[in-house]
């Protein structure tokens, strides 16, 4: 099998992944492919920190601003889109996958279970049953439909019990069955470069970036987007920054409070990203200012 060479630049939000990827793409005649769930969406380039028009004119960028906010995306669908991009460029350019959505990269290079989306109506129905009948009742139902999975989790694990039951009622297949349907991994030799700094050092950088987004027009961006999609279901889009600013726009709290919520949620998100990526021992870690070391790593790998 012909394995393509692919570089992944990963790490928490706001650490400088995009800048490093841009430099590497310019140096090694590469192409940048988005691996961030938020940057897939149109209409929110400021609050999702998408590449500028100038950057995109200098280096090819793929899978940025390619979805409307009411469109749903899964790790499996993203992996399909990314594989198509890789197939089209691997023979001419070095592809750099850049982003902080670790599940996307796992789906592409390791394979993933692709469970169809669950209807909102069914989810609400199951939540109501949990409230009215208790999680023990639902766990006993799960033991009837999917005893193997039920025996593998704690009877009081509300989230997993509800998830397994909703999947069964939505698809007619058990969670056990779905976990046996792993997608095929993309055939590639992957260099995984991680960029990180201690969270205590990242926090002020995140605050500075949010301040910059306010200056760039984040409030106007959210107002425009909200008006455009007012009659459409964008509840499934949970982009940090959008919901926090929307609450202030609606008068539920002040813009200073919106900024505080935005920063708090961004810091929590960065922490979750670090937890995810730290668990992957294939990643070679660098600080953002170690550009020369990163270049040496890439050159050794390419040779």
Curated annotation (Swiss-Prot):
Its cofactor is Mg(2+). One of its GO terms (molecular function) is tRNA dimethylallyltransferase activity. It catalyses: adenosine(37) in tRNA + dimethylallyl diphosphate = N(6)-dimethylallyladenosine(37) in tRNA + diphosphate. The keyword Zinc does not apply. Residues 36-39, 159-163 are annotated as: Interaction with substrate tRNA. The keyword Transferase applies. InterPro entries: Dimethylallyltransferase, IPT, P-loop_NTPase. Catalyzes the transfer of a dimethylallyl group onto the adenine at position 37 in tRNAs that read codons beginning with uridine, leading to the formation of N6-(dimethylallyl)adenosine (i(6)A). Belongs to the IPP transferase family. Monomer. This is tRNA dimethylallyltransferase. It comes from Lawsonia intracellularis (strain PHE/MN1-00). The lineage of its organism: Bacteria, Pseudomonadati, Thermodesulfobacteriota, Desulfovibrionia, Desulfovibrionales. The gene is miaA.
